[in-house]
Design a protein with these regions (language model features):
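Gly/Ala-rich beta-loop-alpha elbow adjacent to hydrolase catalytic centers
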Residues: 19-23, 27
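Conserved acidic catalytic loop of the alpha/beta-hydrolase fold
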Residues: 1-13
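Residue-level signal for short, function-critical loop segments
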Residues: 21, 51, 113
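Short beta-strand immediately N-terminal to the catalytic nucleophile in serine-hydrolase-like folds
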Residues: 14-19, 48, 110
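Hydrolase active-site cap/lid region
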Residues: 33-88
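Active-site signature of alpha/beta-hydrolase-fold catalytic machinery across serine-
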Residues: 29-33, 125
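Core-facing hydrophobic residues within beta-strands of well-ordered domains
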Residues: 12, 41-42, 133-134
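Serine-hydrolase catalytic core
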Residues: 84-162
């Protein structure tokens, strides 16, 4: 993000961050801990079927008996996170909202009603913590993937950006 003004040749006055699935998780973090030029320019964030908890991802993705490897997986994740970000105190248990971050900017959420990838748990966690400053839409015709665009999603997004 620091390089955006250099790449564009100007500093954007209005700026939104879009995040889908795990990208939504990163968007929540970036917008909750903004710094640099985008702190003043950020108008809001757009989350599409976002992940909201690393523990929920790991618990859902470890099949059958692999659940017994959870402590090892948590150890590896924590070690690698601390290697990349030694300055941030994020552990496995607090790698979820609200600990991960709570954006203070407006939030548009477009959630697939039948989210075959993340299920409903991430959405429920988001709704529990971010309802106050969020415009939340559950779309029955939209799958989890961002490869498919549906008319309802487009209309919601365009209307929200025009406000």
């Amino acid at each position: 993000l620091e390089e955006v003004p250099n790449v564009l040749g100007f500093t954007p006055k209005k700026f939104w961050i879009y995040g889908h699935s795990l990208g939504g998780f990163l968007t929540i973090r970036l917008s909750s801990h903004s710094s640099g030029w985008w702190e003043k320019s950020m108008q809001g964030i757009i989350l599409e079927s976002p992940a909201t908890s690393f523990p929920l991802i790991i618990e859902k993705k470890l099949p059958g008996r692999a659940v017994m490897a959870s402590p090892w997986v948590r150890h590896i994740l924590r070690r690698e996170y601390q290697r990349i970000h030694p300055d941030l105190n994020v552990g496995y248990a607090n790698a979820q909202i609200p600990y991960w971050g709570s954006p203070k900017v407006p939030i548009l959420v477009m959630q697939a009603e039948d989210d075959e990838t993340l299920g409903i748990d991430h959405y429920n966690l988001l709704k529990e913590h971010f309802s106050e400053n969020s415009d939340i839409h559950v779309l029955s015709e939209m799958p989890h993937t961002s490869k498919v665009d549906v008319k309802e999603r487009r209309e919601i997004l365009e209307k929200w950006l025009e406000r």
